[in-house]
Amino acid sequence: RCSIGDYRFTEDYVKLFYKHPRGMVGVDSSMVDDRVEGVYPPWGRPGPNTYSAYPSFLNRYVKEQRLLTLEEAVRKCTALPAEAYNLEGRGTIEVGSYADILLIDWENLRMNSTPRETRRYPTGFVYVFVNGVAVIEKDRHTGARPGRVLRRKPDPTSSI
């Protein structure tokens, strides 16, 4: 097993990682309240990946560089992490799975954050369903919070 942060390595190395059949996308972030300004910089604002990691990945490696197909990229963001962490019923759309679904307006998928203002939500995520409940409708949060902490099931064949 291996992990990589795209801020630590050269772009060529990152591309090699993402092209590998087992290379997957993950986000190391924290929970933030977007209505509150922190007191001491740089902790006052979260990093840009807190709001825009996945649109950034999709735009950069699928749209712009054509490193991956959309299908490959989606798998690296969904099914592969669910498999790696043994999250049953997650990462695929099939009978018996949780209804976690994202509908993207591909032409209008954009990061809206800037280095000075990182707390801007992306556009182009038209609908997001978590456990079958709409949490985003037409790029706006519905107020619903059906998510929960996911705990991996032990995998007897894993070394971690």
Label every model-predicted segment:
Residues 1-160:
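Active-site microenvironment of metallo-dependent hydrolases
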